[in-house]
From Swiss-Prot:
Role according to the record: FMRFamides and FMRFamide-like peptides are neuropeptides.
Record key words, sorted: Neuropeptide, Secreted
GO cellular component: extracellular region
UniProt subcellular location: Secreted
Protein name, as recorded: Extended FMRFamide-2
GO biological process, one term: neuropeptide signaling pathway
Main location: secreted
Length: 9
């Protein structure tokens, strides 16, 4: 899991 995907919610 990457932080970029996590912040694109």
């Amino acid at each position: 899991a990457d932080y970029l995907q996590l912040t694109r919610a």
